[in-house]
Amino acid sequence: MSEAAALVFLLDVDNTLLDNDRFGAELGDTVATAFGAEQRDRYWAIYGELRDELGYADYLGALQRFRSGLDNEPALLQMSKYLLEYPFEQRLYPHALETVAHLRSLAPTAILSDGDIVFQPHKIRRAGLWSAVRGEVLVYIHKQRMLVATQQRYPAAHYAMVDDKPQLLAEMKRQLGPRLTTVFVRQGHYAAAGEHERIEPPPDHTIACIGELRGRKLEDFLPSAPVIALAAD
């Protein structure tokens, strides 16, 4: 984008547009079936260590470390096939693509996601989201730390961020202030955990599912005009 838009929509992916929790559950079941429950727990322990180390989910990196001691297991190579051929398009939340199309009809729309540089873009493409936003995709390690770069890529007077993590939305709001409208989607385990946390500032809008945005208008995402008190005659 060369000229500043009035508004740009920024959309998260995992548990916002697609059910990543279900993917994780099915991945765990697949590992358990192939290697046993103990090895499944080992995979998730490696995954957790990598997430703490890198700051993002790295399913492929966890699999790479997981292979230690299992090189002679025929099922190991099938796990890479499972990850790369996983049908993410089937994990889209109801009306997710319709919602993206609706938002694009209102204003420029881009995906702003966290993750590794290989599997996360693959997931976005496989789900059909890359084409849905016409390739307008950003994937960072910590997107809330990349707001300057995001604004340079998509200059706008105002932004609307749609995400399932209320604390992340609050952090972004503290940085951009009134130039950002935050939309909290109550989907997934981060959203559930957020119900018991103090969120400051709170989200501007809270919705139960991504499909609700299909009924919203442009003005719903723009800052309200200030109320000016008139002097009495």
Label each region the model flagged:
Residues 93, 113-115, 165:
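Helix N-cap/beta->alpha junction signal
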Residues 1-6, 125-161, 165-233:
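Asp-based, Mg2+/Mn2+-dependent phosphohydrolase catalytic module
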Residues 17, 109, 161:
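Conserved SAM-binding loop
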Residues 23, 34-38, 47-84, 102:
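A metal-dependent, Asp-based hydrolase signature
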Residues 1-45, 69:
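Active-site neighborhood of HAD-like aspartate-dependent phosphohydrolases
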Residues 60-61, 81-111, 141-144, 148:
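Short, acidic loop-to-helix structural element flanking the phosphoryl-transfer center
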Residues 12-13, 112, 162, 185:
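Short hydrophobic segments within beta-strands
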Residues 97-110, 114-138:
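Substrate-recognition/cap helix-loop segment adjacent to the acidic, metal-dependent catalytic center
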